[in-house]
Amino acid sequence: MDENLLATAATNGVVVTWNLGKPSRNKQDQLFTEHKRTVNKVCFHPTEVYMLLSGSQDGYMKCFDLRKKDSVSTFSGQSESVRDVQFSIRDYFTFAATFENGNVQLWDIRRPDRYERMFTAHNGPVFCCDWHPEDRGWLATGGRDKMVKVWDMNTTRAKEIYCVQTIASVARVKWRPECKHHIATCSMMVDHNIYVWDVRRPFIPSAMFEEHKDVTTGIVWRHLHDPYFLLSGSKDSTLYQHIFKDASQPIDRANPEGLCYSLYGDLAFAAKESLISSDSNRKPYIGDRRHPIFFKRKLDPTEQFEYISSSSALSVFETDVESGSMDWFVHTAKQYALAGRPLAELCDHNAKVAKGLDRNQVAQTWTMLRIIYSSLGTVSSTNLNHSMGKGSTTLPLMNSFNLKDIPSGLGSESRLDRSKGESRTENILMDSSSTLINNEDNEETEGSDVPADYLLGDVEADEDDLYMMDHENPHAEEQEYSLPQEAFPLRHEIVDNPSALDHLQDKADSPHVSGNEAETVSLTPVESFSLISISHSLYENRLPSDFFNPIVRDTLLFYAEQGDVQTAVSVLIVLGDRIRKEIDEQTQEHWYTSYIDLLQRFQLWNISNEVIKLSTCRAINCLNQASTTLHINCSNCKRPMSNRGWICDRCRQCASMCAVCHHVVKGLFVWCQGCSHGGHLQHIMKWLETSSHCPAGCGHLCEYT
């Protein structure tokens, strides 16, 4: 190969070759402009120095001879964008191409009209591929599904022989020279490190390089026969040469013990055999099953990651069938209503579902949420003002109670006697329909429309304004309680009690008090006490729902800590913006992902998708908004359809024709499993309402179920 020859590609589709051996300042050699879109990869033939291959977003691959000014061959994948192309090291005429739709194609450069083989390698775009330098039939691929797969191409059909799960989309893969099972990878985003994997141990990397501070864009081994030096470039504007002996080994920091719960509550625990055998006092548990497995001991760097096995044991603790049953979870998920109804109906329905599954605490929670957040018209609330009249929302209009006239035994209230420190009972008649004292002068106040500021002024119902009279202890120190006239205007003449205290009477002589303010109402604690009534509520008849938000938040945190993310997420969805701001976004996302994972474990796919759609968390809403691509084959010749229309390029027939209207079905397609004819869903349904025979005329008796 010519070490002075370079090839580059640009986003405008231009492929440029550079000759560093030119004596002039301009090193550009050739320029090719045949691609119409971004060129993702250029690759030289391993043995032919003048043969260059390119793959572009336009779906075409072109082979250039650098001795000519145009391409010598054009290969149409008849598929999505080409992501990578790679010549086989061992096979002169073969190259592999990977595509946006997850397919991999093998081509012979002598036959540009059709690929030799095609198979689906990944769920999503395949970003890279690399042929094994020693084994002719091994092809490694990496994709957006975070997997690296090794395929055996020597068989009739491509066979997956190894699979490595990574933590991010795989951008580049490169086999390590002279190490058959080692492969280097780097990520397209999130993870900036370079990993070297042993495909026989896919769960932890054998080596790791951590020098880059941004996304690694390319990796290559320095020489075809040098396994110790790796070159890498990154978006952090650095080019590193890594020495393999300086690589960190994640196995040194790995935990050799494992713990995992199964879907139905079984607990599996794996540990070293030596660790378990050293515990001589360990007693066998009920449901404890032992299985021999293998873990690897800490590796010496000089051993080049050779396999040395050490015995380990796996214990499985099985739970009782009844106690481990998760039927309640499945039934709850299927029966819960999360949207489409008023809040009160949703809460009532979900409370009924929880009650039917004997989950009384959850049912009570839904009932309380209905009371807290529903409107007045949907919930019968308790009068918070203690109204005595039926249907009334105002205080009863009573001026005074004569404690001597109150019959005993009609009502009781236990309170604490602060002077004696003992509990006692006082009887008070609470009946708004009864007249306790005949006060004709006050009749004009009852039911009147006097403005509230005339009755109360600016005084609110504070605790300091309420006076409790002691009528059971007449021998206690006598004290007169007075009500300033400026707060409660008098409606009739009240005679001062002769037993008033002097220090209260002296208050009228104070120079800081006006004459009107000095006039007071004096009441004897033994005789009676006054209640000044108003014509409107002191309080709103309901507390605002925001008042209870901290309590609801703590309730959801309680359920989540107990492991019941189903209740936490369901309440989040039903309440929506009423409670969403009370819980931080990260906590919500954790609850949603946990619940969605449980739903998918139980294969409740529709409910999982509904939760994603109704989610109030932005990160969760994006889970089902990824682009979905559907690739179809021609129903006549079985050839993959191109993205340029609904007519097959080969047989010139329209794909997916409706048997009723004879137009292409571009949406939902329904077909008969007996004769394979079909069409638009509405057309087929309407046809089968009047006829049981296939609309295509094949004579088959079709049935829509």
UniProtKB/Swiss-Prot annotation:
SMART domains: WD40. Zn(2+) 1 binds at residues 634, 637, 648, 651. Pathway: Protein modification; protein ubiquitination. Keywords: Autophagy, Lysosome, Membrane, Metal-binding, Repeat, Transferase, Ubl conjugation pathway, WD repeat, Zinc, Zinc-finger. Zn(2+) 2 binds at residues 658, 661, 680, 683. One of its GO terms (molecular function) is zinc ion binding. Zn(2+) 4 binds at residues 677, 694, 698. GO terms for biological process: autophagy; cellular response to amino acid starvation; cellular response to nutrient levels; positive regulation of macroautophagy; positive regulation of TORC1 signaling; protein K6-linked ubiquitination. It is an enzyme of class 2 (transferase). A zinc finger (RING-type) spans 656-705. InterPro entries: WD40/YVTN_repeat-like_dom_sf, WD40_repeat_CS, WD40_repeat_dom_sf, WD40_rpt, WDR24. WD repeats lie at residues 1-28, 34-74, 77-117, 121-161, 165-207, 211-254. The GATOR2 complex is negatively regulated by the upstream amino acid sensors CASTOR1 and SESN2, which sequester the GATOR2 complex in absence of amino acids. In the presence of abundant amino acids, GATOR2 is released from CASTOR1 and SESN2 and activated. It is found in: Lysosome membrane. Its EC number is 2.3.2.27. GO terms for cellular component: cytosol; GATOR2 complex; lysosomal membrane; vacuolar membrane. It catalyses: S-ubiquitinyl-[E2 ubiquitin-conjugating enzyme]-L-cysteine + [acceptor protein]-L-lysine = [E2 ubiquitin-conjugating enzyme]-L-cysteine + N(6)-ubiquitinyl-[acceptor protein]-L-lysine. It comes from the Eukaryota. Component of the GATOR2 subcomplex, composed of MIOS, SEC13, SEH1L, WDR24 and WDR59. The GATOR2 complex interacts with CASTOR1 and CASTOR2; the interaction is negatively regulated by arginine. The GATOR2 complex interacts with SESN1, SESN2 and SESN3; the interaction is negatively regulated by amino acids. Catalytic component of the GATOR2 complex, a multiprotein complex that acts as an activator of the amino acid-sensing branch of the mTORC1 signaling pathway. The GATOR2 complex indirectly activates mTORC1 through the inhibition of the GATOR1 subcomplex. GATOR2 probably acts as an E3 ubiquitin-protein ligase toward GATOR1. In the presence of abundant amino acids, the GATOR2 complex mediates ubiquitination of the NPRL2 core component of the GATOR1 complex, leading to GATOR1 inactivation. In the absence of amino acids, GATOR2 is inhibited, activating the GATOR1 complex. Belongs to the WD repeat WDR24 family. This is GATOR2 complex protein WDR24. It comes from Gallus gallus.
